[in-house]
């Protein structure tokens, strides 16, 4: 969200070949003009944090509204604990389940108002908490709001709970006409409980908008996996909220689905512990996780093609067009997103009516992805569909997205890309029956533990990794993800100082 002033001065003076004093003077002028905000940096009193104004305001407001939501929650929990514990016990009995202590505590906290974070890896019971919370609360469906950052995550949430679930943008009634949300502190959500799934995907600005629309006294439950990739946008507010130690955090570490023999779940947790999954020996009986050793990118590519065209359809019965998603850490290279899409399109859908747009050929039946939010048409970044008709005379396409026929005129086709292969970042918040993922040192810059972990956890029934133990080892040992400069945790703890220059009101 910000740059440390000394780092900004050094970097800008080097990039622009100007005296550092000129850069420093320029920063001061920007602050006086209200273009940037400068704050004391708690970690070094001789330095400062330089923010774009909108990000500083978002952090500041978010801290303020989270403070309002958590005020008085501890007293409420103590006074109502016995009644809430009885409600949770009844819910567990009705559902025929036994809740772990961490799960039960998370539900008790959520029933008492305030903010609670539920974080855990795959198979640790996050969805069970949401289901039991809804059962125990006694609130009507109109009193509950379920949402997620992406349409696909919201759809999965609805399927798991039987409740309506929306994107956060829909929940807050985003208006393209007004370029903003209709729900805020002046017109808040009229609900008693808000549950957000895949909360680790929220950036600071989206979280700010959400918190502004929730009245004090409302329960806010944030469910996510902080070990996945951070948000694409600025900040990492779920991580900061946990780091602040200002809200209850339920850390789920017991794997409840382990009894089903899921190697996907076991391997994901293995990666998260910094361990390299073993290469799958030849002749291994059918299972749900495989690591196939291949050294060079061309061999990795050939193996992925064989998996998609023959091995997975024949051995597991998955349709490679609709049920198998190839994930890649990067766009470039032999096994990057761009080349994989070209090769897989030619392999899986080589013929049929087509339309060439800006160097991309779209064919009938192609798997495609929307890459921008379009609120007027109700299609969002990350939505996946299939080309249903090629309207060659109009230079347009009809795309089937979740059962809806969306027409793309020629001017809108830059919102579509081929999606036989997508980046791990694009796949976050989604799940697929099967995924295939290259792991190669060609993607050295992106070999990170949280990226590998996120990729593995996208697969529900089958995960196949293709690459080298060396690349896997680099990834699982690399926890040095790009650091996010934020002060949200410090704001929540009351450790930030007044702005040095009040250029912003």
Each PLM stretch: what is its role?
Residues 1-83, 504-505:
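Accessory, non-ATPase domains that flank or precede helicase/AAA+ motor cores in DNA-metabolism machines
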């Amino acid at each position: 969200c910000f740059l440390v002033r000394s780092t900004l001065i050094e970097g800008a003076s080097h990039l622009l070949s100007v005296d550092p004093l000129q850069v420093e003077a320029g920063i001061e002028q920007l602050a006086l003009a209200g273009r940037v905000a400068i704050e004391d940096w708690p970690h070094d009193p001789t330095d400062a944090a330089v923010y774009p104004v909108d990000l500083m305001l978002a952090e500041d407001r978010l801290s303020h509204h989270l403070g309002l939501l958590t005020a008085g929650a501890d007293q409420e929990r103590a006074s109502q604990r016995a009644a809430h514990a009885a409600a949770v016990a009844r819910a567990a009995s009705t559902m025929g389940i036994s809740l772990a202590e961490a799960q039960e505590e998370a539900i008790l906290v959520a029933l008492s108002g305030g903010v609670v974070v539920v974080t855990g890896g795959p198979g640790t019971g996050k969805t069970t908490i949401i289901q039991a919370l809804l059962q125990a609360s006694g609130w009507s469906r109109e009193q509950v709001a379920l949402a997620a950052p992406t349409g696909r995550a919201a759809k999965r949430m609805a399927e798991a709970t039987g409740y309506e679930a929306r994107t956060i943008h829909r929940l807050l009634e985003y208006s393209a006409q007004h370029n903003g949300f209709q729900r805020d502190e002046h017109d808040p959500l009229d609900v008693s409980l808000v549950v957000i799934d895949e909360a680790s995907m929220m950036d600071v600005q989206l979280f700010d908008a959400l918190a502004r629309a929730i009245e004090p006294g409302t329960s806010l439950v944030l469910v996510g996996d902080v070990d996945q990739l951070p948000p694409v946008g600025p900040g990492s507010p779920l991580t900061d909220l946990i780091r602040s130690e200002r809200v209850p955090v339920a850390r789920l570490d017991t794997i409840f689905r382990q009894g089903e023999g899921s190697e996907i779940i076991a391997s994901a947790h293995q990666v998260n512990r910094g361990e390299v999954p073993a290469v799958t020996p030849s002749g291994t009986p059918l299972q749900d996780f495989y690591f196939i050793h291949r050294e060079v990118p061309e061999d990795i590519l050939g193996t992925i093609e064989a998996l998609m065209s023959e091995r997975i359809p024949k051995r597991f019965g998955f349709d490679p067009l609709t049920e198998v998603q190839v994930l890649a850490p990067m766009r470039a290279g032999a096994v990057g997103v761009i080349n994989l899409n070209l090769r897989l399109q030619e392999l899986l859908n080589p013929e049929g009516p087509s339309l060439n747009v800006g160097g991309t050929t779209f064919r009938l039946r192609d798997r495609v992805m929307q890459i921008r939010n379009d609120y007027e048409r109700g299609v969002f970044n990350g939505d996946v569909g299939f080309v249903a008709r090629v309207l060659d005379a109009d230079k347009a396409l009809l795309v089937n997205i979740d059962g809806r026929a969306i027409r793309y005129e020629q001017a809108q086709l830059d919102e579509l890309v081929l999606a036989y292969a997508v980046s791990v970042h694009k796949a976050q918040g989604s799940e697929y029956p099967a995924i295939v993922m290259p792991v190669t040192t060609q993607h050295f810059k992106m070999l990170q533990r949280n990226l590998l972990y996120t990729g593995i956890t996208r697969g529900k029934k089958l995960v196949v990794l293709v690459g080298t133990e060396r690349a896997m080892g680099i990834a699982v040992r690399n926890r040095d993800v790009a650091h996010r400069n934020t002060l949200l945790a410090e704001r929540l703890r009351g450790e930030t100082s007044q702005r040095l220059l009040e250029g912003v009101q």
